[in-house]
Amino acid sequence: MRKLPSGRYQAVPMELNAYQDAARSTAAYPHVGQNPIYPTLGLTGEAGEVADKVKKVLRDREGVFDPEAREAIKLELGDVLWYVAQLARELGYDLEEVASANLDKLVSRVARGRISGSGDHR
């Protein structure tokens, strides 16, 4: 992400940790650095907004994700990502560490034939 003279950001290939650092510079909530509750609540709210936009595509657009709907969902996904980045940082994790651990878990499940089903420790 590159900041333009206009103050807007331009998308460029970036590492997750670079995103997390840039996102942190915009964090303005109570007790930043020692408050995992705020980003957790924000994350659930934003995930709900994603679900609501998808629901409205089903209800109002016959399930067609046209460019307008896709753009609206993209913006909400960005908000989800922002809160994931904040929560990870509040818990002492870099986003790349979280992403790597997630892929390791999924690859292990595939290798053991346990990708389907439920439960954290399958």
Positions of the model-derived regions?
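Flexible "arm" and connector segments at domain edges
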Residues: 1-122
